[in-house]
Amino acid sequence: MREAICIHIGQAGCQVGNACWELFCLEHGIQPDGAMPSDKTIGVEDDAFNTFFSETGAGKHVPRAVFLDLEPTVVDEVRTGTYRQLFHPEQLISGKEDAANNYARGHYTIGKEIVDLCLDRIRKLADNCTGLQGFLVYHAVGGGTGSGLGALLLERLSVDYGKKSKLGYTVYPSPQVSTAVVEPYNSVLSTHSLLEHTDVAAMLDNEAIYDLTRRNLDIERPTYTNLNRLIGQVVSSLTASLRFDGALNVDLTEFQTNLVPYPRIHFVLTSYAPVISAEKAYHEQLSVSEISNAVFEPASMMTKCDPRHGKYMACCLMYRGDVVPKDVNAAVATIKTKRTIQFVDWSPTGFKCGINYQPPTVVPGGDLAKVQRAVCMIANSTAIAEVFARIDHKFDLMYSKRAFVHWYVGEGMEEGEFSEAREDLAALEKDYEEVGAESADMDGEEDVEEY
């Protein structure tokens, strides 16, 4: 078996986790108490869901997941919520006092006390696996726990499980909507560590997903639940090949191989289609070519950045439902002819496609329509540098006055870490610039050397 362990860190990670596990259970016909009704004969022919669930002797299915937060309220919601019987109590770990939006508290003072316990639980889950593929880490980098403890945990996982791939679903601060003043500090410090210790990081941003739900689902004031359910669909599409059978299955490590041209350039854009409400879906065709075009629209991106401003380096399209390879090839051929979708000149093919026959499942009473087919795109584009540029700019404004820095230094951080992290991100922006640069001018220089 190729198992994957999910790690949900901090408030964002745990709440996204709730939405994801709700969806995974629905997709596999697992009830909130972990039982799988006997009339569901799915389990007989298809046990691929064991990548995400482990089966106990009593026939209960337990998610291979850990929820951790430095303060109890969010994890308590899981402990008392609909799915309280699904998780093993030891998998829900909470501390007493929170990180207070402070990276240093999450990484040094408070996080340090809880991290060994977390690793111990993760070790237990890993021992239950026959062939662990890797970890899916869900967190946000704007707060204290997700950024600080998230970075600390990833560093420790790199040491303990060096060769296993680590995929991050990372919520980055939005351009306009902010939940904390010190977001830029936390993000820069955390990204400094993510550069080293994650293999692929899918960037999400609340504002982009707000706009998407508001525009496409006609929800005037989307709540976090609406957003998380949409993120859940994306995560589900990306991991569908691990959990179901299909024509073209895609493995965790395959993402890495196909999306990451250079180790540092591993921050990817995601988008999903069709995001459509039930009233509209009734009147639309939603053919393969339509949904394939939709995922390339700047408006469907889950991060506020315009892919038209950059070039694509690689792109995975994960189809699910009633889709045949012939349609996919036709759709991809059309996309390649479009002028708006530009690839870097050193990546001529650039597309990886996956097809999964399981149609997308929707949460009953949710906002998304039940559709026959859906596609999720995960792409590596140089446009994502916009996100870093934006955060770096805000960081510089605050750091030039050393505002709020004493809170971090007081928790045992050194001021040098700020400048070190900031320099690392400046180098990252430079890397993106160079990758997107025309390689034609480089040929000219090489000719000079030869003659």
Swiss-Prot record:
The keyword GTP-binding applies. Its main location: cytoplasm. It comes from Trypanosoma brucei rhodesiense. Mg(2+) binds at residue 71. This is Tubulin alpha chain. The active site is at residue 254. GO terms for molecular function: GTP binding; hydrolase activity; metal ion binding; structural constituent of cytoskeleton. It is an enzyme of class 3 (hydrolase). SMART domains: Tubulin, Tubulin_C. GTP binds at residues 11, 71, 144-145, 179, 206, 228. GO terms for cellular component: cytoplasm; microtubule. The keyword Metal-binding applies. PANTHER family: TUBULIN. It catalyses: GTP + H2O = GDP + phosphate + H(+). Tubulin is the major constituent of microtubules, a cylinder consisting of laterally associated linear protofilaments composed of alpha- and beta-tubulin heterodimers. Microtubules grow by the addition of GTP-tubulin dimers to the microtubule end, where a stabilizing cap forms. Below the cap, tubulin dimers are in GDP-bound state, owing to GTPase activity of alpha-tubulin. The modification N6-acetyllysine is found at residue 40. It comes from the Eukaryota. Belongs to the tubulin family. InterPro entries: Alpha_tubulin, Tub_FtsZ_C, Tubulin, Tubulin/FtsZ-like_C, Tubulin/FtsZ_2-layer-sand-dom, Tubulin/FtsZ_GTPase_sf, Tubulin_C, Tubulin_CS. Undergoes a tyrosination/detyrosination cycle, the cyclic removal and re-addition of a C-terminal tyrosine residue by the enzymes tubulin tyrosine carboxypeptidase (TTCP) and tubulin tyrosine ligase (TTL), respectively. Acetylation of alpha chains at Lys-40 stabilizes microtubules and affects affinity and processivity of microtubule motors. This modification has a role in multiple cellular functions, ranging from cell motility, cell cycle progression or cell differentiation to intracellular trafficking and signaling. The record marks 451 as: Involved in polymerization. Dimer of alpha and beta chains. A typical microtubule is a hollow water-filled tube with an outer diameter of 25 nm and an inner diameter of 15 nM. Alpha-beta heterodimers associate head-to-tail to form protofilaments running lengthwise along the microtubule wall with the beta-tubulin subunit facing the microtubule plus end conferring a structural polarity. Microtubules usually have 13 protofilaments but different protofilament numbers can be found in some organisms and specialized cells.
